[in-house]
Amino acid sequence: MPYPFKLPDLGYPYEALEPHIDAKTMEIHHQKHHGAYVTNLNAALEKYPYLHGVEVEVLLRHLAALPQDIQTAVRNNGGGHLNHSLFWRLLTPGGAKEPVGELKKAIDEQFGGFQALKEKLTQAAMGRFGSGWAWLVKDPFGKLHVLSTPNQDNPVMEGFTPIVGIDVWEHAYYLKYQNRRADYLQAIWNVLNWDVAEEFFKKA
């Protein structure tokens, strides 16, 4: 949905991802962090009515065409809104333990299996210095790639379609895991929703 952007519902209670992601982290992450991105994105766009009907993905793909005074705000807050909107959908109580369907086939063909993908995606997440995201993405030619982005940059800015995104900002895990990013990354595999990832893959 375009402007005014709204904070999406999670679709599950904050405590639903325990013990892997604690309820307090989920509440603060959703209400405070994601909520701030939505508020700031709307504030940036308020004085440009011609942009009010534009989806956030389109804004991010065409940052250079936006008024210069809002490019950074849209990049940071539009990226934060899109990234988290995807992230909440990709988490589920109990998780879908492994990829299915067409996505599973593509992973097997391009990475040599799910375990190899897990290792590659975890490496991308561990290797992201500071704040950012690790992604499984699909390119315009149908191939899968693993990459990481800084801050709140989204792969759509580089022409990719996100399939799975893992938040490695400290606010995603610090209350429970402190500086132990590796422990958080090990835990998050228990709650990733591969059914939704399959849905994203088919639509890409």
Swiss-Prot record:
Catalysed reactions, as listed in the record: 2 superoxide + 2 H(+) = H2O2 + O2
Cofactor(s) required, per the database record: Mn(2+)
GO cellular component: cytoplasm
Cofactor binding remark: Binds 1 Mn(2+) ion per subunit.
EC number: 1.15.1.1
GO molecular function: metal ion binding; superoxide dismutase activity
Record key words, sorted: Manganese, Metal-binding, Oxidoreductase
Binding site for Mn(2+): 29, 84, 167, 171
Protein task: Destroys superoxide anion radicals which are normally produced within the cells and which are toxic to biological systems.
Similarity-based family: Belongs to the iron/manganese superoxide dismutase family.
Subunit structure, interactors included: Homotetramer.
Protein name, UniProt field: Superoxide dismutase [Mn]
Gene (name only): sodA
